[in-house]
């Protein structure tokens, strides 16, 4: 060995020892931080299902489906990482002997083909990702409003560029080494090298004229550079366990494996149950037995589960959640990404103190008698630090969330933002009684009257007045819900809100026309509890939900049809947690089946003039309700229903299906003022109006209310009669940033008929539920 080789060997050995040691230190720090979290039940099995899901996610990269370039680029870079580790191992041998190769597989041409193919692909992929980041990164000199439009706003760009530069340097070194190996073997008279160097022989040939000594020196230097760069990455990453853009390479595998849904799918639909520190679910029956020091929800960092802490460590700061968040898009301070980063940094700073205190208190001084570790931790000033009071999560951030699930849907590493935000809300509501003042009235109305409007139960059947047929009530007109085809769950909005009543009446008329027998509960209904649960009042939710489950079981409910997407999600996805298991259909699903079966027949344009066809020949755009679409994957039936209306033209908004933009009502936001930034409903209404649609079709009463008011607000701000000024996706309509007023759906004291009319003026698109549009398109004699 030459002097250079000895020097290079010493350098790579030292770099490796330091790199591996510091990287191991980082691993230990992350594991210890995650372990301060609470138990997260059900995250380990079934193993086979979870492994299959993990493999499918890794191979398919399904969360990147709307970004094909990023999908391919990220995939090849990701796959090259473990594949090219073999070249790193070979590099150590090349420092000692430039012609050294891995035993057995070192000169197998299939292996060499794979190495070269992925090396080139990774090089192109990392360049593409670098250019993309450079192109959409926020400009430092730009105003904040403009910088916020970048999904990388708030991300650590220096760390990201470091990671990308490291990948580029390592992959480039691999290719250079391959070319130098070709040149060395060519000088040695080897034949058939084209088979072994399929993608590097073309430039390796340029070096074949060099001397053997020079080529061997070049191999040693290139191998040393590759190893030192790799170990430098390990050093930097090991020293920064909060560097998610690097650590996600390892943590994402664990996070995806431990996802909430073992068979796949995002953590949407039902919320995780409220649990104690040991993972025991909290219900109404267990409240009396709770210890005095029990903490409900996530008030401090140690109240989060280990999976929630792993979520924060895994965040790669890609900003896809931020890019899709309706609150962030309308100028509010909530960014799901920044919430995760804030929790991550706080956990990393707090965990060492919590661990040290727990360890010190594990054994009484001078004895072997064990003591309560948690009690010892609670004496530490770093323990129990209120996440909101300490400024880790600002109240405006916490309460801006609509729980639409866009962040969860977009996250490529399965972070469960909504569950974490609601857990923090639970603590604030249940333990601190700290919540927006409007919610106080909503909670009271839910508790006393069983609906957020605060109206009497006897008014729940007012919507049926004037129908030319009787609506049977279970217990009065029919003995059991099992005696009819469907129990029609009307919901609070469908019973009390004037615009939603139109949907309720339309569904009843359509079911009657199709010969489907149904009955309602009348004053036996109460709110499903969705607004209480999303607002963090889990105990009020359980009170309402338990009452409903008991009633539904008593009346023998088997098949239930609902018009509200929130009721649909709660009854079908959350009531099973309380023992209520029913077959639940959204009205668009049932009506679509009835149309497909020929039991409902929309009229052709011009047929039976004056007898129907009120919406035919019109341009319709459809708004996907979050709790029907993203949370429950119901996208096709509503569109098939619209397609069944003769002459109707469907004009999709730019943001539709999985990427649909929230109306602003979810997460109990329907009952809170919206005084920060632009109104979400107006932004969505502007996007709908930009399609040139005559009708904005909805499939949820909350969406109908919010978009009706949004359309009216946009039309008023335009100042014109047509109200159809172009407004692209994400546009912020002028004049729609005022606080919610008496015509807004956001006030707790808003009456059942509050808000602007569905059609505010001539030329302004109508906002109507699909059921209303379908009913209007049928022949009058049918109804």
Give names to the regions the model predicted.
Residues 1-292, 297-298, 337, 341, ...:
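Membrane-embedded alpha-helical bundles of multi-pass integral membrane proteins
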Residues 173, 179, 205-212, 216-217, ...:
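Iron-sulfur cluster-binding electron-transfer modules in prokaryotic oxidoreductases
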Residues 318-321, 407, 665-666:
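Cysteine-cluster motifs in flexible loop/terminal segments that predominantly coordinate metals
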Residues 233, 316-319:
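Segments forming glycine/polar-rich beta-alpha architectures that bind adenosine-containing cofactors
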Residues 247-250, 263-266, 333-334, 420, ...:
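Acidic/polar loop patches that form or flank catalytic/metal-binding clefts of enzymes
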Residues 270, 276-307, 345-391, 636-645, ...:
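Short, charged low-complexity linear segments at domain edges
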Residues 2-135, 303-312, 334-340, 347-579, ...:
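Iron-sulfur-cluster electron-transfer modules
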Residues 325, 411, 707:
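Cysteine-centered loop/knuckle micro-motif
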């Amino acid at each position: 060995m030459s002097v250079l080789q000895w020097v290079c060997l010493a350098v790579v050995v030292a770099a490796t020892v330091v790199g591996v040691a510091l990287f191991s230190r980082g691993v230990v720090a992350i594991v210890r931080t995650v372990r301060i979290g609470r138990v997260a039940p059900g995250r380990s099995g079934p193993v086979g299902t979870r492994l299959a899901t993990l493999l499918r996610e890794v191979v398919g990269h399904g969360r990147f489906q709307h970004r094909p370039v990023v999908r391919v680029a990220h995939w090849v870079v990701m796959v090259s990482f473990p594949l090219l580790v073999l070249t790193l191992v070979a590099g150590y041998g090349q420092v000692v002997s430039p012609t050294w190769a891995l035993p057995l597989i070192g000169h197998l041409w299939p292996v060499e083909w794979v190495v070269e193919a992925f090396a080139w692909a990774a090089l192109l992929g990392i360049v593409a990702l670098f250019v993309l980041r450079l192109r959409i990164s926020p400009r430092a000199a730009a105003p904040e409003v403009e910088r916020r439009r970048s999904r990388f706003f708030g991300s650590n760009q220096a760390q990201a560029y470091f990671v990308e530069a490291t990948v580029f340097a390592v992959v480039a070194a691999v290719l250079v080494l391959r070319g130098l190996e070709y040149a060395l073997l060519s000088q040695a008279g080897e034949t058939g090298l084209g088979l072994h160097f399929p993608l590097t022989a073309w430039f390796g040939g340029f070096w074949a004229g060099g001397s053997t000594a020079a080529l061997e020196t070049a191999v040693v230097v290139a191998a040393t550079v590759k190893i030192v760069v790799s170990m430098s990455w390990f050093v930097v990453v090991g020293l920064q366990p909060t560097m998610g853009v690097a650590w996600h390479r390892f943590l994402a595998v664990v996070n995806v494996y431990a996802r909430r849904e073992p068979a796949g799918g995002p953590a949407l639909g039902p919320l995780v149950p409220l649990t104690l520190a040991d993972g025991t679910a909290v219900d109404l029956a267990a409240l009396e037995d709770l210890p005095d020091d029990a903490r409900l929800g996530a008030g401090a960092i140690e109240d989060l589960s280990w999976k929630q802490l792993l979520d924060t460590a895994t965040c790669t700061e890609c900003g896809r959640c931020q890019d899709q968040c309706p609150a962030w898009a309308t100028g509010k301070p909530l960014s799901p990404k920044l919430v995760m980063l804030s929790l991550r940094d706080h956990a990393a700073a707090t965990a060492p103190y919590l661990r040290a205190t727990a360890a010190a208190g594990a054994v009484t001084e001078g004895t072997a008698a064990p003591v309560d570790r948690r009690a010892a931790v609670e004496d530490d000033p770093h323990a129990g630090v209120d996440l909101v009071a300490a400024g880790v999560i600002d109240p405006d951030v916490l309460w801006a969330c609509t729980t639409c699930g866009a962040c969860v849907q977009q996250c490529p590493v399965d972070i469960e933002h909504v569950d974490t935000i609601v857990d923090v809300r639970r603590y604030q509501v249940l333990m601190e009684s700290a919540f927006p003042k409007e919610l106080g009235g909503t909670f009271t109305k839910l508790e006393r009257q069983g609906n957020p409007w605060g109206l009497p139960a006897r008014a729940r059947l007012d919507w049926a007045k004037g129908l030319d047929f009787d609506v049977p009530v279970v217990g009065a007109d029919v003995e059991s819900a099992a005696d009819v085809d469907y129990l029609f769950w009307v919901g609070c909005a469908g019973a009390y809100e004037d615009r939603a009543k139109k949907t309720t009446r339309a569904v009843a008329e359509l079911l009657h026309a199709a010969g489907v027998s149904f009955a309602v509960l009348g004053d036996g209904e109460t709110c499903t509890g969705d607004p209480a649960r999303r607002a963090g009042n889990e105990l009020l939710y359980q009170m309402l939900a338990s009452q409903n489950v008991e009633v539904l079981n008593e009346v023998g409910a088997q098949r239930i049809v609902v018009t509200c997407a929130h009721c649909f999600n709660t009854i079908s996805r959350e009531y099973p947690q309380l023992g209520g298991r029913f077959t639940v259909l959204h009205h668009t699903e049932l009506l679509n089946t009835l149309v497909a079966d020929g039991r409902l027949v929309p009229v052709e344009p011009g047929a039976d003039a004056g007898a129907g066809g009120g919406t035919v020949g019109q341009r319709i755009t459809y708004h996907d309700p979050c709790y029907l679409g993203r949370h429950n994957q119901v996208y096709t039936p509503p569109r098939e229903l619209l397609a069944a209306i003769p002459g109707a033209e469907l004009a999709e908004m730019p943001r539709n299906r999985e990427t649909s933009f929230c109306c602003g009502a979810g997460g109990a936001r329907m009952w809170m003022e919206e005084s920060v930034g632009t109104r979400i409903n107006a932004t969505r209404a502007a996007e709908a109006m930009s399609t040139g649609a005559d009708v904005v079709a909805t499939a949820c009463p909350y969406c109908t209310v919010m978009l009706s008011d949004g359309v009216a607000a946009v039309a008023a701000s335009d100042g014109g009669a047509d109200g159809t000024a172009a407004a692209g996706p994400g546009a912020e309509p002028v004049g729609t940033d005022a606080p919610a007023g008496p015509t807004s759906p956001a006030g707790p004291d808003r009456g059942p008929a509050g808000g602007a009319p569905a059609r505010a003026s001539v030329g302004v698109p109508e906002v109507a539920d699909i059921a209303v549009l379908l009913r209007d398109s049928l022949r009058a004699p049918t109804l």
